[in-house]
Amino acid sequence: MKTRFRKYSKILFGVIMMLYFVAVSHNVYADDVQFTQKTYKILFVGNSHTYYNDMPKMFKGLCDADKINCEVTSITSPGYKLSQFADKTNMYGSQVYQALTNNTWDYVVLQENRAVLVEKEEEAEAAVNTLYTLIHNAGAKMVIYATQPNNIGSTFKVDSLSLFLSDFQIEQILTRNNFKIADEYDGLVAASGTNFMRVMQDYPKITMYKTDNLHPSVTGSYLAACTIYNTIFDRSPYGNKYLPNSEYDKDNLISKVSMKNALIMQKIADSRLKVDSYYTTVSKGQNSKLTATFTSTQTDESETTEDTTKKTKDETKTSDEKETTVTDNKDTISTYTNKIMWDAVDANSISINRITGEFTALKAGKYQVMSTTDSGLICYSTIDVKQPSTAFNINE
């Protein structure tokens, strides 16, 4: 009797395990089908911060390594502003206009000139307003590529005053205004600049800039590509096989990046901070709540990182791209609590609970609130506060 029971128990256990693996396989397959059965058409529009180091091709490499079919097109010109790309009488603006009116797209990645975002944010908004109509009609989702600040700060003309802003101050303005514009048009923000600052904070020995202290190094462009990849597909780049000297690095675009540093860039771009609503409309005096979520696929991968690094050969680097390979195993996720905190840009207009995200709209107008983590992630949401209508009773 016991022998028969054991026999049936083994059969039942085998059936259960078989069903489990079938279910897991089905879920993985269903997730992959979402990407493998479609070819995504993606257009990049920007200046040198987009085309330096062939960053859009790096993005394509990440897609290829993850078996995501995509066609990537770029329209770029050095120093250009979105207002020029939005002008169809401009040489490159005409190319953008033709690309958006004669084709359908899945995503259009826009990158604004940093000086415009700091000095003339309304000009950037007007340009995006023009481009958004074309993007929407082309069936695409708009993505704002938020770039890094100057490494050593810079002087800007703000409200007729010449002000020197540090890299941190520039990054704050760039991030806030990029989110402000994206929120207005239901766009996504690829916060590469935020991730740059996180690398500079936690891995100061990694070379993230060219010698001009403005444009990204190859490592910096790889971080940007990883950030945009995660933003568009909501798919972590952590563990992606598009790595230096891999079969997917066909053009040797990232051969100058050490394996260790490439994995760090993937790790930094892996974690994201998301808000349940990036644009909320409420009435003055109304109470409401926003919820932010921190996401990361990371676990302690120090052993895997070390094993992979040992397999890496030393690469020859030009003097402009020579970087320091980080030798520590600091995990930027595990060393932070990543507790989410809230704050209002204008506390006199929006009163928000720093812990819960519950807020009260105090004044009519559009205002931003931000959620942050101690690991340096930041996300802005726009609250559109309407003046309540007043009802009048007329007695005859």
PLM feature spans:
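Conserved beta-strand segments of alpha/beta enzyme cores
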Residues: 69-71, 141, 188, 341
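Alpha-helical cap/lid subdomain in secreted, periplasmic
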Residues: 97-218, 230
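Bacterial N-terminal signal peptides
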Residues: 12-23
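Sec-dependent signal peptide cleavage junction
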Residues: 22-34
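Bacterial N-terminal signal peptides that target proteins for export
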Residues: 2-13
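Conserved SGNH/GDSL esterase-like catalytic core that processes O-acyl groups on lipids
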Residues: 40-43, 49-126
